[in-house]
């Protein structure tokens, strides 16, 4: 008996997911494989990917467009949360996985499949993200992961695919593993596995090297409404258009390159290269607007929430009660995060040079050291006395007694 009768496979057209089709049928006895390719703005030729899946033996090859959903339902909440895993990675790949899982489950229910499958190996984070998301959305569905079990080397995997007439896209001159969507691009493997080696320029595609960026900076004004970016330079844009324009502008100035050692959920450290031009600028601009509009107590408490939120998303717990609860808190904080932030993009740096909001808590008359100062300096002495009372009491007990 096969492991499942009908399987919906998350399909990218790459080596692993292409080989999964004949492997599921010939090695695991699956009767029917339906592939699902999701358009997340990666720029792939989806019609060619559909045709490739059918040639590889899929009964049906489907495509779902989900760029707007990825940005509006996943990236925008992450921007409101200032989500940066280990303070650096803006979760461009991690945010896409629960959406793909949701579409997998929807298609499986539509076509009457009893299982879904993905091409993740047993070493990465994506296997956890897919498996947990699917379990949360439909625990009755089986989850198959052939690449996690087949035990083939890369060369053996390619040879297996060629045996079934599948054209292999990987060339020996391009050893990198790449993931791309409209939120960003991630690269690993090859020379990048040596943590002491500078990444060659060929690794990058969305951002220019500093040497190739313009000598003159670019300025962009980003308008937010309740923490959501809605305008660039006074022009209201939809989510996709906003990301496309800002990716191009920031990337041309070298903004958004990340070279980091990150801690994977499975317990290993991994060297990753990310390019996230728009996300990098938007999170930084959003933080600047929050500093203007949120109270000190909310701002400081939210810092801890942001770390937890980033870890949840990275660790595959998007569909969890805690993530939903954190989103509810964050949405409440965003009611006054409306305004405009002016960013300067230059030589790989995105720097805030101005911010304004109708809900600004910044009062120049209280902050100034010049004429018009309305701060009551006489109140400082009493404030310091009360604020320091616990410290003085402790000192009298411990210092005064000679302890």
UniProtKB/Swiss-Prot annotation:
TM region(s), chain numbering: none
Q: Does the keyword DNA-binding apply?
A: no
Q: Where in the cell is it found?
A: Cytoplasm
Give the source's domain of life in one word.
Answer: Bacteria
List of residues binding ATP = 10-18, 119
Q: Does the keyword Transport apply?
A: no
The protein's enzyme class:
ligase
Q: Which EC number applies?
A: 6.3.4.5
In terms of PANTHER family, this protein maps to: ARGININOSUCCINATE SYNTHASE (PTHR11587:SF2)
Q: Which NCBIfam families match?
A: argG (TIGR00032), PRK00509.1 (NF001770)
Assembly and binders: Homotetramer.
- In Swiss-Prot or TrEMBL terms, this protein is called Argininosuccinate synthase
